[in-house]
Amino acid sequence: MNIENKEITSSWFTNLRDLLCKEFEKIEEEYAQTKGLKPAKFVRSSWQRNGGGGGVMSLMKGAVFEKVGVNISTVFGKISPEFRNEIPGAELDGKFFATGISLVAHLKSPLIPAMHFNTRYIETSKSWFGGGGDLTPFYPEKNETVKFHAAFKEVCDKYDSSYYPKFKKQCDEYFYLKHRKEPRGVGGIFYDYLNNGNFEQDFAFTQDVGKTLLSVYPEIVRSKLFLPWTAEQKEYQLIRRGRYVEFNLLYDRGTKFGLMTDGNVEAILMSLPPEVKFN
């Protein structure tokens, strides 16, 4: 396993975490100032994994972000024998290293889309990058969806013109609730097992995906920050959040990987909404 690659990827995810938290706190502050409220701040808690490594959870519950979590983790060790065949390159000895960042934002306003983003670097006897970002609006708007996709298409095209159509398709297929026969949201990009034989290029792409999210999502949030909403719209948001819960518990690879590698359960389930209704 390449020690330098581990260090620079882990360092980047920590840096991106700091940038995201700072930007989201800034949005909370902008809103709080106009409403005479005390702005919310992220609360951090660290955890250690028994088999090796650990992570830091950053959680904020505010007036804009009902619940937003930004987690970073770097874990290593051996995967249990019963799960080794599910992780490429871990079949023989089970050794693995994984570092990454994950973000899930659930907004108080039903007019502002929920956001999911993660990027990661994993080593077994093989190595690869994965990640992506997807938007889940409760009241979709075409212009907003187009803008979101255009931002990720631009970063994809910078590296390979085949990336965006491929990663968009993978996102559409991945974030699909088979039992309901419906998509979770309006998509985005999703990639996994990315290894083109050029670590620097794959890493640069993964960094740019993070920078794109840092730019496009706060802009979407700010555009609807002060729009009024109704009790009926809030009720609909709570019901639709149930789809988020269903996907994360039934299909999400990150949830499964975290549980298979004895990760922190609270951090793994951070993606679940703070309030939800099932009718």
UniProtKB/Swiss-Prot annotation:
One of its GO terms (cellular component) is cytoplasm. A divalent metal cation binds at H106, H116, H149, H179. It is found in: Cytoplasm. Pathway: Porphyrin-containing compound metabolism; protoporphyrin-IX biosynthesis; protoporphyrinogen-IX from coproporphyrinogen-III (O2 route): step 1/1. It comes from the Bacteria. Belongs to the aerobic coproporphyrinogen-III oxidase family. This is Oxygen-dependent coproporphyrinogen-III oxidase. The lineage of its organism: Bacteria, Pseudomonadati, Pseudomonadota, Alphaproteobacteria, Rickettsiales.
